[in-house]
Swiss-Prot record:
Residue ranges that the UniProt entry lists as topological domain Cytoplasmic: 1-20, 66-100, 149-158, 214-220
Locations listed in the record: Cell inner membrane
The protein's name in its UniProt record: Heme exporter protein B
Gene this protein is translated from: ccmB
Keyword NAD: no
GO biological process, one term: cytochrome c biosynthetic process
The organism of origin for this protein: Shigella flexneri
Function of the molecule: Required for the export of heme to the periplasm for the biogenesis of c-type cytochromes.
PANTHER family assigned: CYTOCHROME C BIOGENESIS B-RELATED, HEME EXPORTER PROTEIN B
Length: 220
């Protein structure tokens, strides 16, 4: 099926540019590490501010990786070829965003036990953090994809991309950190996780169509 061919192709291309995959991950880890060094290793304080630290770091590292979502395709001319495929353009966008999450969002999940240890979180707090990252990081990709499509042809589109995308991530940031706060106090988190799941479902449904329209505008 052509959808999965595009998905596998995107993964192969991403692994050929391993430095661009590693840089956001290093940025994420460096930001997480700086907080214990700057405010001290007090476990209670670190556990209290951990949700904000983790999600701001995840958001900023995702923005670093988002810029290359369509950039290479535009530079080598393959973006126009993708638009001419018999597969609908929203499906192409969905395959690209899924592959992008596999190489940028999934590694954050793998690093989550280390992050929990650095910030003095308990096992339950780590489990909830992992769930928020599982639901939230693909949502970041879907929220950012239309902005990337609009700025793909600009030489210095990184700042504009941040201005477009960051306000859209505020609800995600609120509910993800609220879930982690509730977990730290051993309160129910199901409602927050349900909202994060709804945000993921909504963005996964609507974002490919908005991104496809933005790509057509940028290419014209």
């Amino acid at each position: 099926m052509m959808f999965w061919r595009i998905f596998r192709l995107e993964l192969r291309v991403a692994f050929r540019h391993s430095a661009e995959i590693a840089n956001p991950l290093w940025f994420f880890l460096i930001v997480i590490t700086l907080f214990p060094l700057s405010i001290g290793p007090e476990p209670q304080l670190l556990a209290r501010i951990a949700p904000g630290i983790i999600w701001v770091a995840a958001l900023l590292s995702s923005l670093l990786a988002l810029e290359r979502l369509f950039r290479d395709d535009l530079q080598d001319g393959s973006l126009e070829q993708l638009m001419l495929l018999p597969l609908p353009l929203p499906a192409v966008v969905l395959a690209k965003v899924m592959a992008h999450w596999m190489v940028t969002g999934l590694p954050l999940l793998i690093l989550s036990p280390l992050v929990a240890m650095l910030l003095g979180m308990d096992v339950y707090g780590w489990q909830v953090m992992a769930l928020t990252l599982l639901l939230g990081t693909p949502t970041l990709g879907f929220l950012g994809a239309p902005g990337v499509a609009l700025t793909v042809g600009l030489k210095r589109g990184g700042v504009l991309l941040s201005i477009l995308v960051l306000p859209l991530t505020i609800p995600l940031l609120i509910f993800a950190t609220a879930a982690m706060d509730a977990a730290s106090m051993h309160l129910p988190v199901e409602g927050y996780l349900a909202i994060l799941g709804a945000l993921l479902a909504g963005t996964a449904t609507l974002s490919p169509f908005a991104t496809a329209a933005a790509l057509r505008i940028s290419i014209q």
